[in-house]
């Protein structure tokens, strides 16, 4: 057996792995300040009416006054329903919680359906908790650290000043280690949290800007603080209700947030937390931020889940629930009757419905051009036209998937630009759904049917030299 070894002198270019998702090109809804959609903006193309409706929902969420509303995004496949939800997510920012789940995610052996839905609802409610902390903020004048010969207890003094006053603080082991870790020197402007002992380096004083010293490119010069050394500052922490539930429900506390092993959380714990949060809200210590829960493929939920959502929407702590489905009149899971979009009529009655329409040829061309730019693929104009034609005749998803495949074929030809022949070869190598269905119908007898039957036919050879197997 031969073992291939690489030449040590040979250099290989290591490219960084950049994962590009289906909706990574979307950065917002593409609306102006009057909620009017631009034809192409922030990765969104077309669907003007649906985007404007989503913009109204976005304003409702940002105002934070209205919660417990259900929004259904309904439309044919490949019309941008998930993209619309991703646009809402990007526009909300990091302070407003956005939770995205698929309808099939809640069916788990570890959690009941109602528990999984409850956790998703609680993840979508944010709590802004205001906390007053005492800080020591000033410019370091001098640091004196006395270390014993035996390497035991360390002592030190920190001289710190503002423009109005100067003070000397005694340092213990923990503070000395913190200052050493942050590499604090004389002339640095620092902030010390009195409660936790956390040291934050704010920058270097302007008074030391002319000192002859080696400084990095990221060195920041700041003014020496004014007034008192000790200041009170209000800090705002944003957490979700689910995170508070987890911390208060298990023995390991916040460690369960990292392991993900939250398990079932008792309703008594949640009731106590709801009561405490309501108290904080009345006292002005906390502010409730209703977020968005997005349930994709909502028709996969069953009748018990829909009944739970009906009740949860009326709760005091309820987010805005966005749902997406591509079903028409279909059977509701867990029942024998059909209903529009596969949802019960009572939930449909509570929902406001946004419809998406199929993209036209020009919109498909624009979307494919954006996707190619996102995937860093250079397409020739003829190749883009052929991909657009393929997208119109088959589907947008199939045409979008051909971009990266055609790039690999072009790279094999040592060409950086994807040409028409690369797209044609990719089209012949990979079938779309319509051609796949046609192939299955033509060769149906060779496939195993739903009864487990398959027809295996062996054609007899007409070769005169073939071995005679007859007796």
Swiss-Prot record:
UniProt record, GO biological process: box C/D snoRNP assembly; chromatin remodeling; DNA repair; protein stabilization; regulation of DNA-templated transcription; regulation of transcription by RNA polymerase II; rRNA processing
GO molecular function: 3'-5' DNA helicase activity; 5'-3' DNA helicase activity; ATP binding; ATP hydrolysis activity; DNA helicase activity
Keyword Calcium: no
Residues at which ATP binds: 75-82
GO cellular component: chromatin; Ino80 complex; NuA4 histone acetyltransferase complex; nucleus; R2TP complex; Swr1 complex; TTT Hsp90 cochaperone complex
UniProt-annotated location(s): Nucleus, Nucleoplasm
InterPro entries per the UniProt record, alphabetical: AAA+_ATPase, P-loop_NTPase, RuvB-like, RuvB-like_C, RuvBL1/2_DNA/RNA_bd_dom, TIP49_P-loop
Keyword Transcription regulation tagged: yes
UniProtKB keywords: Activator, ATP-binding, Chromatin regulator, DNA damage, DNA repair, Helicase, Hydrolase, Nucleotide-binding, Nucleus, rRNA processing, Transcription, Transcription regulation
Any further remark recorded for this protein: Present with 3030 molecules/cell in log phase SD medium.
Assembly mode: Probably forms a homohexamer. Interacts with RVB1 and may form heterododecamers with RVB1. Component of the SWR1 chromatin remodeling complex composed of at least ACT1, ARP4, RVB1, RVB2, ARP6, YAF9, VPS71, VPS72, SWC3, SWC4, SWC5, SWC7 and SWR1, and perhaps BDF1. Component of the chromatin-remodeling INO80 complex, at least composed of ARP4, ARP5, ARP8, RVB1, RVB2, TAF14, NHP10, IES1, IES3, IES4, IES6, ACT1, IES2, IES5 and INO80. Also belongs to the R2TP complex composed of at least RVB1, RVB2, TAH1 and PIH1. Interacts with SPT15/TBP.
Family: Belongs to the RuvB family.
Protein name: RuvB-like protein 2
């Amino acid at each position: 057996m031969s073992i291939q070894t690489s030449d040590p002198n040979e250099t290989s270019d290591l490219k960084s792995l950049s994962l590009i998702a289906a909706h990574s090109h979307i950065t917002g809804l593409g609306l102006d300040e009057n909620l009017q959609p631009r034809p192409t903006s922030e990765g969104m193309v077309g669907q003007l009416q649906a985007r404007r409706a989503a913009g109204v929902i976005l304003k409702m969420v940002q105002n934070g006054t209205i919660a417990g509303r259900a929004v259904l995004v309904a439309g044919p496949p490949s019309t941008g329903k998930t993209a619309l939800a991703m646009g809402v997510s990007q526009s909300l920012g990091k302070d407003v919680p956005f939770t995205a789940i698929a309808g099939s995610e809640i069916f788990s052996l570890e959690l009941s359906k109602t528990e999984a839905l409850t956790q998703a609802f609680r993840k979508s409610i944010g709590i802004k908790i205001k906390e007053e902390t005492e800080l020591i903020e000033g410019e370091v004048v001098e640091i004196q650290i006395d270390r014993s010969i035996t390497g035991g207890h360390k002592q030190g003094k920190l001289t710190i000043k503002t423009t109005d006053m100067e003070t000397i603080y005694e340092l213990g082991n923990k503070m000395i280690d913190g200052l050493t870790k942050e590499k604090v020197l004389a002339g640095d402007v620092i902030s010390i949290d009195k409660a936790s002992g956390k040291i934050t380096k704010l920058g270097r004083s302007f008074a030391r800007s002319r000192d002859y010293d080696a400084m990095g490119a990221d060195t920041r010069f700041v003014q020496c603080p004014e007034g008192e050394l000790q200041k009170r500052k209000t800090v705002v922490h944003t957490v979700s209700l689910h995170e508070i539930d987890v911390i208060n429900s298990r023995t390991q506390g916040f460690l369960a947030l990292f392991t993900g092993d939250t398990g079932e959380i008792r309703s008594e714990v949640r009731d106590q937390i709801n009561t405490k949060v309501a108290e904080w809200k009345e006292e002005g210590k906390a502010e409730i931020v209703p977020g968005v829960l997005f349930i994709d493929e909502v028709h996969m939920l069953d009748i018990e889940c829909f009944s739970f959502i009906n009740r949860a929407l009326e709760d005091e702590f309820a987010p805005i629930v966005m749902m997406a489905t591509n079903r028409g009149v279909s059977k509701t899971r867990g029942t024998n009757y059909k209903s529009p979009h596969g949802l019960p009529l009572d939930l449909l009655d509570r929902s406001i419905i946004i419809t998406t329409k199929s993209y036209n040829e020009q919109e498909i061309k624009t979307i494919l051009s954006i996707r190619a730019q996102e995937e860093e693929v250079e397409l020739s104009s003829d190749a883009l036209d052929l991909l657009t034609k393929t997208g119109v005749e088959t589907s947008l998803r199939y045409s979008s998937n051909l971009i990266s495949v055609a790039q690999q074929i072009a790279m094999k030809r040592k060409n950086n630009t994807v040409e028409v022949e690369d797209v044609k070869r990719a089209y012949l190598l990979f079938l779309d759904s319509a051609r796949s269905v046609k192939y299955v119908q033509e060769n149906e007898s060779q496939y195993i049917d739903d009864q487990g039957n398959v027809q295996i036919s062996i054609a007899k050879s007409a070769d005169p030299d073939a071995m005679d197997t007859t007796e």
